Amino acid sequence: KVVLATPIAETSLTIEGVRAVIDSGLCRKLVFDARTQLSALQTVRISLDMATQRMGRAGRVAEGVCYRLWSKASESRMLSQRLPEIEEADLAPLLLDVVAFGEQHVEELPWLTLPPRPERILATERLRNLGAITTENSITPIGKKMAQLPCHPRIARMMLSAPSKEMQALACDIAALIEEKDPLAETESGADLSLRITRLRQARSLHQIGRWSRIAQIAREYQRMIHTEQSNTDVSPEDCGLLIALAYPERVAKSTDGVGHFRLADGNNAQ
C-alpha cells in the first residue's frame, strides 16, 4: 500500500500494510484574505512538523520509506511549525459566538493563541456591517438568530433578512451553492449564480437530482431551520443580486454624487 500524503496522513490513523509514503510537500488549506474579506482554498507549502508527521505513517506497523518530493534547499525555507489556524482564519464566526455568550472583550479570554488584533478589528467591523453586533460589541436581536444557525454570519444574515417566503427559499438555495463545491465547470457556465439556481431547481422538479444531491440536501436543511418551504419557480438575477448584497454589504458600490458615479469596494470609481 502507498499513501499519497495529505493532512489525513498527519493524524494518528494506522492503516495496516502501509510501508511507503509519497509526500508532495504541499497541502490545501482555507486561508482568509483580509483584502478581499473572503476565504479561499490555497495550495501552500507544509511545515517541517507536518512533514515529520507524514513520514511517520510509513513506519507505524513495520519499517518503511518516505519519499519527499522537494530539495534540501526548499526544506531550508520551510517553517519549523505550522501557523495556528486562528491566525489565518476568518474570525467573524468565532467573534459572533463569543459575543453571543455574553463576552464583549475578546482579548480578555484565556486563549492558547490570541487572535491577531488587526483581524479582530476587521471581523468586528464585518459583524457590525451585518447588523449582528452594536458599536458597544453587544449582540443584536438578529445577531442572536444568526449565531443559532450553523453557517457563516454572512449566510445567516442573507437567509434571515430575505423579504418574502419566496426569497427565503432562494436564499437557502444560494447558501447551499456557496458552501458546496460548484457542480458546474466554469468553462461551461462562467460565474452566473442565477444559472446555477435554475439548474438546481430544474433537477429538483424533474427528480433528476444527480450531482446536485448534496446541495439540495443542504438547502432543504436551511429551509427547515428558518421555517420556509422549498421553491422551484423561475429565478431572476436581480433577486440573486439583492440577496448576495445582504450577505456582502461592503461589496456594494456606494454613490458618491447621486447622479450615477460610484465608489467600488476596491477603491476604484465607476459610473
Where are these regions (language model features)?
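Alpha-helical architecture
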Residues: 5, 21, 54-55, 138
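The conserved phosphate-sensing helix
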Residues: 15, 60-66, 106, 120-121
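Conserved helicase motor
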Residues: 6-10
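Conserved motor-coupling elements within RecA-like helicase/translocase cores
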Residues: 1-3
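Short glycine-rich loop/turn motifs that provide flexible caps or phosphate-binding loops at active sites
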Residues: 11, 16, 24, 55-58, ...
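Conserved segment of the helicase C-terminal RecA-like domain
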Residues: 20, 26-78, 94
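Second RecA-like catalytic domain
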Residues: 22, 27-30, 70-271
